[in-house]
Amino acid sequence: MKACFMGLGYIGLPTAIIAAKHGVEIAGVDINAQVVEVTNQGKLHIIELGMEEMLREVLASGHFKAYTEPQVSDAYFMVVPTPFKGDHEPDVSFVESATRMVLPLLKEGDLYVIESTSPVGTTERMASLIFSERPELEGKIYIAYCPERVLPGNVIYELVHNDRVIGGMDEASTRKVMEFYGQFVKGTLHPTNSKTAEMCKLTENSSRDVQIAFANELSFICDKAGINVWELIDLANKHPRVNILQPGCGVGGHCIAVDPYFITAEFPMESRMISTARETNNYKAFWCAEKVRNAMLRFELKRGRKPAVAMMGLAFKPDIDDLRESPAKGITTKVLQSCNNADIMVVEPNVSEHKLFKLTPYKEAYEKADIVVFLVNHREFAGLNYRDDVEVLDFCGTFKK
């Protein structure tokens, strides 16, 4: 079987490589010619431990090659971004564009699968698009929705071992698509329909967002009450039926920070708690930025000079290079905009350069800083010795003080 993966980003490329590793002939497609070029050279354009070696293996074996245009295949997977537009309205234009690209290639017996996080009903809408353009294919191809559920930084393991939800447009589609994923997924494959599978993905990430909002709300309360929130949560979690997550500087990434809007946009009256959680997590970044600005003002009033500030971390979570929807990046931007010529050192050990920020090595920034702001709990920061001689704003629990 030959499979065509539309999109070679943080999910599409690893999934394509894993499938190729298990013997599937893969055509990986991306409209970014530079991504295609470096991928075919065996270089990974994302950070994912162990994945570059695997990419070189599947290129050498002939099971994988990247292209800028879709190739004739037996299965087509839409793994493209689904951002939001306007007032947090879901934008499925990339899914539609990728679908239109493969439309001329579809033939009887082919699989068409959406992995991109999508609003409920997207698979049905794409099926209608396909059949309106290619009516001869109705009832003759297999269409399903199968959401990814992996953690960046642990993708190789999770793509293989995590359970997957397979939501077909009909039972035959579900069975056929389960057969494909069964070639490389060791986790259990759970059959359902496409709308339930779409809602399942949105529910998983919205659930995480609500739980993080509770932790972030505790951080507001503890800050005002003079309580160490990290100690509080650790003690509360000693209860056998309590499992509070860790607070942070907000919620980022292209899943948890985005997916709840796919629910609230379509079901606004029925999703008030989900909406409030989004507001809480968005507010946390503004709260953190204000804390930094206040610390800078106190320093200047006390010392009579501008402080040197180390902003530690830009990624949306630890130990990755993904800055999408990152609250740390937003906080850093706000601090830079109001720094009044203070020395702001921006640190991100997983990124070599950035078009907006001048990056400083983390040890250098930590040693020079008058104020240290921990935004992301990268593994490199764990090896630093706590400094009692400067103000440390720890928004991610690096030292839990």
Which residues does each predicted region cover?
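Structural/interface elements that position substrates and couple domains in central-metabolism enzymes
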Residues: M1-K401
